[in-house]
Amino acid sequence: MTTHRKPSQEQGFLNGQFLLAMPGMSDERFARSVVYICAHSGEGAMGFIINQLQPVQFPDLLRQIGVIGEEDLIILPDRAQHMVARNGGPVDRTRGFVLHSDDYMVDSTMPVSDDVCLTATVDILRAIYGGGGPERALMALGYSGWAPGQLEMEVAENGWLTCDAPLDMLFDSDIEGKYSRLMLHMGIDMSQLVSDAGHA
């Protein structure tokens, strides 16, 4: 049996936390974005934008990658029928990733925090299609990556706010309202927010 270790929470690293783009974000791809950080160390960082939608629906993606056929669309479980894909970031945009609750674990699963995991194999898609898989999940195409020291510099230059990532905020279906609700959760008045803010 494989033993899965939880990621270390070394001081200064942001594993399992949210980044919220500041209003002065210079990269338009990340404007008003909420990014969930999955891995952060001295070697760099990676995460997923969770509040930008992809034009492809989950059933269509399953069909495109050969998990199901056209005739299977009508028998998809309700959750799979309504699952939407997120634009995870500008890197490797054709690759799929699933962030999910820790009640699903296979050899390729990477624990991100005490209750969130990441799986990037087709097995989890088949499990969801079959009505199983994790209780809570979101799928992203592509990811966001930072070189060593790059994310730390962007945070120091007030490109991002950082905050804890409540499960309800991570997995809820209100994608378009997520940025504003997280700002309120942090006690920040958007009308007064300026680009010289710091950490929450």
Curated annotation (Swiss-Prot):
The intrachain disulfides are none
**GO CC annotations on file:** cytosol
Q: Name one Pfam family in it.
A: DUF179
Among InterPro entries, the record links this protein to: AlgH-like (IPR003774)
Name the Gene3D superfamilies on file.
VC0467-like
**Which family, according to the similarity comment?**
Belongs to the UPF0301 (AlgH) family.
What is the recorded name of this protein? UPF0301 protein BOV_0485
Q: Which organism is it from?
A: Brucella ovis (strain ATCC 25840 / 63/290 / NCTC 10512)
